[in-house]
Each structure stands twice: as structure tokens, then as C-alpha cells.
Regions:
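Acetyl-CoA-dependent GNAT
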Residues: 6-51, 61
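Conserved active-site alpha-helix within GNAT-family acetyltransferase domains
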Residues: 91-108
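C-terminal "cap" of GNAT-fold acetyltransferases
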Residues: 113-146
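A short, internal acetyl-CoA/4′-phosphopantetheine-binding micro-motif in the GNAT/acyltransferase core
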Residues: 56-64, 89
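Conserved GNAT acetyl-CoA-binding A-motif
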Residues: 77-88
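A conserved short alpha-helix in the GNAT/GCN5 acetyltransferase fold that borders
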Residues: 71-76, 100
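Conserved acetyl-CoA pyrophosphate-binding loop and the N-cap/start of the following alpha-helix
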Residues: 63-71
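Conserved catalytic-core motifs of GNAT/GCN5-like acyltransferases
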Residues: 87, 105-119
């Protein structure tokens, strides 16, 4: 079972339809997890403004500790973001549960902002991110240089 971390347009185009979004390589970054040659998870980062960055996450398999380290290291360490923002439809219970399990909190709720109803704005700050420490970082053998 071979795992690897990759980045680029292929990952972005894999994530976009799974999060009902789009990927624009010139304005975004994407980091993916590959298992036996197939992308099983991916993250798109966009709208970096010098303080915060928006993320969209798609998962079709299990995540590795090293991948979790990389996908949080990129915005917080490489970009220097103070906050990650993850917009999720309130009707998408799988994604809301995933965000909560990862440590995101609901910072805002925008009524009727998605076709299904409300839009939840999940956020995370570096000081609340459990994935940046040695527990996950030591398991990362090839940090993404995305």
C-alpha cells in the first residue's frame, strides 16, 4: 500500500466537482493524497489575502498523519495565515462533522446562502490546530512544497 503526497492542477480538478466548486490554477493551490496511483483526498486553497485563506476539502478514503500535517502546514507555516476558512453547506452533514472533528469551529452562519439553505463558515487558527506538532509532523516523509 503506497501513499504519496502531491500537488497541482490534477488535484484541484479532482477536488472541485466533489465540493461543488471550481479550480483555477492561477489563483489557487491544491494538495492531494495518492494511494496506489489514485487520488483519495485533496484540498484546494484559494482567496489568500495575507491573513486568511479559504479551503475546500474532499476525501474518498482514509487520511494519513503525514498528509494532515502537510495540509495544515501549508496555510499556517508556509503562507503564514492566521486563519483558515472552510465554507460548508449546513445540509452537508458529512462535511460539517469532518470539519468539527478536525478542530474547526463555526464562526458564522449565513442564511439562505446555498441552494440547500444556510452556509456555515468554519474557521481554524494555528494555535488551535492539532496537526502541526510532532505527533503528525514526524510522520511526514515528504513535505509538500506547493
Amino acid at each position: 500500500m503506497a501513499w504519496s503526497i502531491t500537488h497541482g492542477a490534477e488535484v484541484g480538478h479532482w477536488v472541485a466537482p466533489r465540493v461543488a466548486g471550481q479550480y483555477h490554477a492561477e489563483m489557487s493551490q491544491a494538495i492531494g493524497l495518492v494511494r496506489e496511483g489514485k487520488i483519495v483526498a485533496g484540498v484546494i486553497y484559494e482567496n489568500w489575502n495575507g491573513a486568511s485563506i479559504v479551503t475546500h476539502i474532499a476525501i474518498e478514503g482514509r487520511l494519513t498523519p503525514g498528509y494532515l500535517y502537510v495540509i495544515y502546514r501549508f496555510p499556517f507555516v508556509q503562507c503564514g495565515a492566521r486563519k483558515i476558512i472552510a465554507p460548508v453547506s449546513a445540509t452537508n452533514t458529512k462535511s460539517t462533522t469532518m470539519c468539527e472533528d478536525m478542530g474547526f469551529i463555526i464562526e458564522a452562519r449565513i442564511a439562505d446562502a446555498t441552494p440547500g439553505g444556510d452556509l456555515l463558515m468554519f474557521t481554524m487558527t494555528a494555535d488551535k490546530c492539532k496537526y502541526l506538532g510532532d505527533r503528525y509532523g514526524k510522520k511526514c516523509q515528504s513535505p509538500a512544497s506547493a
